[in-house]
Amino acid sequence: MKKFKNYIEKNSERFLNELFELLRIPSISALKENDSDTRLAAELIKKHLLNLGLNNCEICETKGHPIVYGEKIIDYDLPTILVYGHYDVQPVDPINLWDKDPFEPYVKKTKIHPEGAIFARGSCDDKGQMFMHVKALEVMLDHGDLPCNVKFMIEGEEEIGSDNLEIFVKENKEKLSNDIILVSDTGMISKTIPSITTGLRGLSYMEVEITGPNRDLHSGHYGGTVANPINILSSMISSLHDSKNKITIPGFYDKVSESSDDEKKASSLIPFSIDEFEESIGINSIHGELGYSTIERQSIRPALDVNGIWGGYTDEGSKTVLPSKANAKISMRLV
């Protein structure tokens, strides 16, 4: 381990600069205007894989953003690890809540991170973790200590639902064959406790639109006589959870398995600090489905959240409009 540590310390500045180069690319998969940046990120990752001497490095086209692939086969009799990650990031709005340009990375010490942390869009979801595995492979290759075959599959659509990943996997079963998949998109229980994540929740995402009159109306004339789409949408959203914070959609829990006693016991033994959790996100009380711990709520229980809501007049000042429509974006974490 000492030789690995020495190599990392010797090359840490270069590692950081290379990561910063990747973080500066605004590879926002949800925005069409960022398509060229998203491809640029894919090309940079391919370049890093080539620099490590990986074989069959390619940018694999899909109907959306491309998937980067590369492999290092030492011996076909050895086990094979497939590293999964993604190079796309989420939109940065509202931009005014950022202290600095979200695509100009910097290191800052905070109360939560007294040793310093990298601040930038994608630094921890998922360019940072993904690049960590690329550099870990570099370290091992430099010392000739790679005990297995390694394949990389880095996609560019994770933040928008991975629409083309399933198709790619089905069409490339032989290429992607492996003994174990290492997902470089998870977290740790705490900064000092390494964690092995064995499962992740799935995602279903939708946009809801409620329509009313054929145009925006003046509430002084029409208020009280016409159904207001925002009122209807708000009522609908408020009805999605009951007083115990259970999701009220009929059939939602039909295929959700309850945790076994052994699983509950294992979950209770995880050294998870509620105080650290609350402090890290700036809250003073927890919330969620009654009867389950915070660990269970964020890992093995489904969840439904409204990710955005809009309609009517939202600019500065007042405008007594009765809107013609209202919209919301809703995500569901599935198990």
Describe the role of every protein-language-model region.
Residues 1-95, 325, 329:
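N-terminal helical capping/dimerization or prosegment-like subdomains
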Residues 72, 210, 332-334:
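Hydrophobic beta-strand positions in extracellular immunoglobulin-like domains
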Residues 78-151:
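Active-site metal-coordination/substrate-binding segment of hydrolases
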Residues 111-112, 206-220:
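The feature captures the short pre-catalytic strand/loop hairpin that immediately precedes
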Residues 122-199:
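Acidic/histidine-rich catalytic neighborhood of metal-dependent amide-processing enzymes
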Residues 189, 198, 219-309, 321:
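Acidic-enriched catalytic cores of C-N bond-cleaving enzymes acting on peptides and small amides
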Residues 195-211:
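Flexible glycine/proline-rich, aromatic-decorated loop/lid segments
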Residues 235, 314-335:
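C-terminal catalytic subdomain
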